[in-house]
Amino acid sequence: MNRISIYRIKVLAFLFAVSTYVYPASSLELNEEARTVKLNSEGQSLTLNEEQIKKGKRLFNSHCGSCHVGGITKTNPNVGLDLESLNGANPPRNNINALVEYMKDPKTYDGSESIAEIHPSIKSADIFPKMRDLSDDDLKVIAGHILVQPKINSEKWGGGKIYY
């Protein structure tokens, strides 16, 4: 290697080290608008704090991520966790309370029957042990994570095989 190549490598290594120190990926700070989501169907909203955002992401990844990575639904690619799909459900699942209710007792997309025996939920915690240790607050922050993601990842969240 000549001197110029070694110099370039050193400069690139330095820039990389500085960029990871100055702009760490884990320190994404969301503004209040991005952290504000619908609380209920009456139009009330809730602003999640940074700790709730982090906890929601962690719980989503550990309890829901194996089937819903990136907001998709592996068992039914036609219905994801994107806002369009959540709005289209009956009743709509586009707010914290509706998603918490769904995680407690999931219903089909048209709302006609319970699917608790085939979808992890609090109601079916005996079949799906991952759900046993989740409190109402845990469900709330998971729902918050689901609703914040479209604001962060826009079309990628729930975008399916195109992105993941």
Swiss-Prot record:
Location of this chain's protein in the cell: Plastid, Chloroplast thylakoid membrane
InterPro entries: Cyt_c-like_dom (IPR009056), Cyt_c-like_dom_sf (IPR036909), Cytochrom_C550 (IPR029490), PsbV_cyt_c550 (IPR017851), PsbV_cyt_c550-like (IPR016003)
SUPFAM superfamilies: Cytochrome c (SSF46626)
Gene3D superfamilies the UniProt entry points to: Cytochrome c-like domain
Keywords associated with the record: Chloroplast, Electron transport, Heme, Iron, Membrane, Metal-binding, Photosynthesis, Photosystem II, Plastid, Signal, Thylakoid, Transport
Record-level GO cellular component terms: chloroplast thylakoid membrane; photosystem II
Domain of life (superkingdom): Eukaryota
Bilayer-crossing regions: none
Chief subcellular location: plastid
Residues bound to heme c: C64, C67, H68, H119
GO biological process, one term: respiratory electron transport chain
Topological category with respect to the lipid bilayer: Peripheral membrane protein
NCBIfam families reported for this sequence: PS_II_C550 (TIGR03045)
Protein name: Photosystem II extrinsic protein V
